[in-house]
Amino acid sequence: FITSGDHDLTENIIHLVLARADDSPAGTKGISLFLVPKFIVKDDGSVGPRNGISTGSIETKMGIKGSATCVLNFDDATGYMIGAKEKGLSAMFTMMNNARLGVGGQGIGVAEAAFQHSTEYALNRKQGKSTIQNKHGTIIDHADVRRMLISMRADIFASRSIELENAKAIDMANATGEPEWINKAAFLTPITKVFGTEIGINISNLGVQIHGGMGFIEETGAAQFSRDVRVTAIYEGTNGIQAMDLVGRKMMDNGETAYAIINQIKEYIDNLSGVKKDLSVLLGLANETLRETVEYLISKKEVSERFGGAMPFLMGFANFDSLHISSFLFLSNVIFFFEMGQSTLLLCN
C-alpha cells in the first residue's frame, strides 16, 4: 500500500525505487530496481526499526488534489534489489506499459465526464434567443455550442475505439502468441496513451468554453476537468516521449506493423466505395498520404531525424485509424441489429 507516500493505515509501506548500485555503470544502463520498506522487517516477519525514509513535503498541485503527491527523503535507507541487477528500467517499463493504457483511459473518462457535464448545462442554460424553439430555448440551440458538443462526442468515440482496438490486440496477443498481434498491441500502446489524453485535454477545454463565463467560475465544476486531466499528458511518459517511441522503437520493423494497419484501412475504404464513392476516394487519398508519411519516416535511418514530426504523425495516424475502427464498429452494429430483426429499434435510437 503505497498511496500518498506515507500513512498509518497499515503496519508497513513498501516503496519500489529505481537506484544505482555502487559498482554499476553511470547512465540508465546501471539502474536497478529496489524494494525499500518504511520499517525494516525482522527475520520472523515482524515489524522492526524505522528505515531511513521520511516525507519531506506534500506538493501543491494544479489538479488531482484528491491524491497526495509527496517528496520522499531517503537517508541511509536500506533497500533490497529486485530482479536482475542493472535491469531496473526493463522491469519498470513492464509496469509503465500497463500504466499508459490506464492513463489513456483516464483521459477518455475525463472527456466523457466533461461532455456529459457540458451537455446538461447546455440543455438548461437560457441565454440569447433561440432560432429553432420559438425564441425561448437554451444555449444548446446555438449553432456553435452544438458544433462543440458534436466535436466532443465524435472525439470521445474515436479515442475510445483506439483504446478498444488496443485491448483487442493485447487479448489476441496473449491468447495466440502470434507476432502480428504482439507487434500491433505494442504499436498501439503509445497511440492509446497520447490520443486519449490529448482528446481529454481538448474536450475539457471545450467544456469550459460551452459554460461561457461560468466555466471560469469554480462553482460549475467545469474547470476541474481541465485541471485534473492536464497531468495525463505528462505522467507515465510525456506525450512527446510516447510519440518518439512510436516513430523510433515501434518502427524498428521497417514499418511492417504500421503498413499492416494501413492495409486494413484500405480494405475498409475499398468496401465503402460501393456505398459512398466520393467519400471513399477522399479517404483513399488520405490513406496513401499516411502510407507515404510512414515511408518517409522509415527512410530516415537516423532515428533522431524522425522526432520533429513525431507528435503530428501520431495524432494524424490515430485520427485516421480511429475513423476506420469506429466506422467498422458502427456498421457492424447496424448489420447485427438488422440481422436480429431490430431495424425499427435501431432507427429509433
Where are these regions (language model features)?
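C-terminal helix-coil-helix/basic helical segment that borders enzyme active sites and/or dimer interfaces
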Residues: F157-K193, V294-G308, N333
